[in-house]
Every structure is written in C-alpha cells, then in structure tokens.
C-alpha cells in the first residue's frame, strides 16, 4: 500500500484490509472482485491484483507461509528487488540489500557514488547488503530509510545531526548535488477527454467491466476516450450502439469531473440515457444492477463519485460545467 499511497491514508485502510484478509490463505480464498472492492479508492489497482495472485501462489507453493528467500520472493507477482529485500530484512531479520530513494541518497552521498555512474545502483545495493549483514538487518535497513527521510534530505541536509557525517564524502567535498539527489518527478501534462454514460433500463443501471487497462476487473459506467472536442451525445450513442448493441434515447449532459492517474489529467464528461431493452451482441462484459447493489461492487474512485451523484440530493457530486448539449427527445 505504501508504494503509492501516503502513510496517513494507508493506516486505516491497512487495518481494515488485514481485518478482512488476515493471512495469505484468506486472501487466496477470496474472489478478485472482493479484493478490488476492499482496495477501492487507493488507486493503482495492479497492487491489489498482484497481492491476490501472490497469495494464491504462496498457498500453492509454500503451504500458506511467506518464504524468506529472495529468489522465492522475487517469483511472486508484484515483488521486485526492493520489496524482496524489505520483506527478507524487516520481516525475517535476515541480511538483504534494499534500495529506495532515501537509502540511495544516504549511501550514495556517504560512498560518493555519482548519479551518472553506470553501476551506481549495484554499488549502493552491495553497500546496503554488507551493512545489513553487520548487525540486525531489520534495524539497519529501517534506520537507513529513516536517516534519509528525516536527516539526509534532498535539499539542505541536516549534516550536524547525521551519525554518518564523519564518513560522508558528499559533506567532505560540499557537493551534495553530485551524490544521488532526488530524481525530478515527471510532470502531469497529458490532457485527456473522456465521455461516460449512466444508462438506465427502468430502475437498473448498466455497468461494464474492462478486460484490460488500469481498471480491469472492476466495474464502471460505460466509458470511452474522446478523439475530439464536444459531440458528447454522439459519442455516447456510438458507444452504446457499437459496444452494447442498444440504441439509447433521452441522452443529455449531466456534468463532469476530473481525475488524475500518473501523467494523465482527465476530464470525464457524464451523460445520462435511457435504454429500450437489455444489451445485445455486446463486445464488453456487462451487467444491470439496482442502485442498492452499487455499494457492494468494486468501482474506481471516479465511478464511485458518479454513483453517488445518482442518489437523491447528490447531483452536486458532478461539476455542471460550461460544456452542455441540449437534451434529446
């Protein structure tokens, strides 16, 4: 959870998740839909999918017990060198190298490893591994992370408070910028326009389940990316006719919302429509659900916000916006 989510946001979600799935066996026995529903709102759902897949392999290959070997850990979905090292050292107190941004900065500065050196990562990893083997791996690796987080800062490091300052080449030479400083984050610059439809057949809402992409395995109101500006109603009609085999009526603009995923800044335009019959010859997985069923299904955060807007008195969950199209009769 902490790989992409803040500690403050993680703590209550972690406690709830562990309460629901206290061990690998209970997680493996759950359906993917149940796991995604429990993860809802934290984004980066590949993490949840990998956890579920890893739990099933842990039960199948290791009898439900998490392995301590780096090779066995690396064979589990979602576990790379860093996570394997963190599990081995922190959970089992066994020697392991683990290099995150904080440890990279601390050891890079102490050792004088320039960011541009081709084998910098390998050298820092080996230094971390050696240090972890010299004491309690659990304490050493966590101490290095804390040192980077609280003292060896990317800018204006607190060298006077650092227990390693006497051995630090970066301090000796006064060149902190050369030794593995922070990596600039990629700016969110890609603007994306999407259209989404809350399509109703009597008192039921049409949902679809993507088979790929970041929301695969979850449920969403039918959605597609817009190639050009405007023409929302036409895009919705095309979406429902092409992918669900149904021609809608009463299409009108409801509002919009914005959401961000990695470098994509997306404006999602929401329209509503009526369906004359159930979808036929659909190219997507779909289902019709009653309003009360929405709470129990895994929905991405933007879709959960749209679902809330369907409740009486909650229409302000969407931005009415300036881009509106006339209602269609």
PLM regions: where:
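Intrinsically disordered, low-complexity, charged terminal extensions of DNA damage-control enzymes
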Residues: 149-329
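Catalytic cores of DNA base-excision repair glycosylases
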Residues: 2-177, 245-247
């Amino acid at each position: 959870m902490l790989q992409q989510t803040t500690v403050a946001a993680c703590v209550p979600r972690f406690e709830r998740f562990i309460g629901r799935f206290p061990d690998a066996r209970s997680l493996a026995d759950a359906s993917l839909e149940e796991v995604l529903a429990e993860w809802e709102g934290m984004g980066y759902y590949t993490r949840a999918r990998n956890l579920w897949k890893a739990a099933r392999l842990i039960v199948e290959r290791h009898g439900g017990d998490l392995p301590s070997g780096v090779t066995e850990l690396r064979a589990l979905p979602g576990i790379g060198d860093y996570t394997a090292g963190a599990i081995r050292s922190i959970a089992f107190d066994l020697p392991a190298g683990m290099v995150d941004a904080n440890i990279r900065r601390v050891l890079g500065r102490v050792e004088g490893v320039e960011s541009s050196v081709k084998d910098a990562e390998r050298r820092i990893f080996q230094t971390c591994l050696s240090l972890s083997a010299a004491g309690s791996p659990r304490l050493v690796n966590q101490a290095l992370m804390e040192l980077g987080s609280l003292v060896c800062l990317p800018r204006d490091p607190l060298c006077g408070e650092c227990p390693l300052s006497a051995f630090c080449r970066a301090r000796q030479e006064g060149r902190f910028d050369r030794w593995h400083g922070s990596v600039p984050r990629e700016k969110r610059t890609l603007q994306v326009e999407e259209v989404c439809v809350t399509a109703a057949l009597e008192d039921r809402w049409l949902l679809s389940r993507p088979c790929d992409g970041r929301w695969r395995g979850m449920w969403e109101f039918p959605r597609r990316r817009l190639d050009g500006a405007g023409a929302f109603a036409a895009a919705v009609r095309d979406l429902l006719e092409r992918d669900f085999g149904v021609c809608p009526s009463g299409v009108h603009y409801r509002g919009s919302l914005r959401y961000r995923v990695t470098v994509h800044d997306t404006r999602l335009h929401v329209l509503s429509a009526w369906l004359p019959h159930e979808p036929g010859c659909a190219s997507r997985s779909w289902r019709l659900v009653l309003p009360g069923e929405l709470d129990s299904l895994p929905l991405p955060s933007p879709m959960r916000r749209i679902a809330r807007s369907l409740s009486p008195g909650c229409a302000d969950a969407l931005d009415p916006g300036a881009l509106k199209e006339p209602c269609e009769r």
